[in-house]
Amino acid sequence: MQDTTLHIRHLGKQDYESVWHAMQHYTDTRNSESPDELWIVEHPPVFTQGQAGKSEHILNAGDIPVIQVDRGGQVTYHGPGQLVVYPLIDIKRSKIGVRQLVTHIEQSIINMLAKYDIQAYAKADAPGVYVNERKIASLGLRIRRGCSFHGLALNVDMDLAPFRRINPCGYAGLEMVQSKALGGPQTVTEAGEQLTITFSQLLGYQHLVHHQGLAAS
């Protein structure tokens, strides 16, 4: 039976690697009673290269570090002004498949943007969320021990220039867009609050418990 409680962890601004390793640790040590969690964070500038990533898609990293990680997908960029959300969900317990979880994540972004009269959509062959053929959110997951980690990145109010140093998600010339320019959420905090609502509604969580920072390990 699915626990209908979702724990929301507000991590503020944190470096990528420490949060990544904390996600791995939570996933590796959780059991059938461990709660599902949603981690909300903002990272300093970093390129992350997924398991399908090819080095030729990093055109000119410059002074921005590149980290090889254990999620699906190819290269993407994280930076200030971008909302990053990591759903740590026991999909085995929740009885949902990986594809269904991806669809739920994409739809939660689409539903959130619809509140601002922004018509966003997903693409079957290219995970993420798009507005007028420009990408507003990227997505990459890893499933281990029947549980998800990694997640989504929504462009809110950031410098989009570093995306031009890569082929985002392996697509040359893919244009990026952000919510502030479209009349959507103006801050990462606002976007996080709204996305938490649409995500929890779609996955059937009825009780949200908020925490500041990571749990003591």
Swiss-Prot record:
A Gene Ontology BP annotation from the UniProt entry: protein modification process
Disulfide bonds: none
NCBIfam families the record matches: lipB (TIGR00214), PRK14342.1 (NF010922)
Function: Catalyzes the transfer of endogenously produced octanoic acid from octanoyl-acyl-carrier-protein onto the lipoyl domains of lipoate-dependent enzymes. Lipoyl-ACP can also act as a substrate although octanoyl-ACP is likely to be the physiological substrate.
BPL/LPL catalytic domain residues: 32-207
Positions annotated to bind substrate: 71-78, 138-140, 151-153
Active site: 169 (acyl-thioester intermediate)
Family: Belongs to the LipB family.
EC number(s) given by UniProt: 2.3.1.181
Miscellaneous field: In the reaction, the free carboxyl group of octanoic acid is attached via an amide linkage to the epsilon-amino group of a specific lysine residue of lipoyl domains of lipoate-dependent enzymes.
EC class: transferase
GO terms assigned for molecular function: lipoyl(octanoyl) transferase activity
Residues the UniProt record annotates as site (Lowers pKa of active site Cys): 135
Pathway(s) per entry: Protein modification; protein lipoylation via endogenous pathway; protein N(6)-(lipoyl)lysine from octanoyl-[acyl-carrier-protein]: step 1/2
Pfam families listed in its UniProt record: LplA-B_cat
Domain of life of the source: Bacteria
Subcellular location: Cytoplasm
Protein's recorded name: Octanoyltransferase
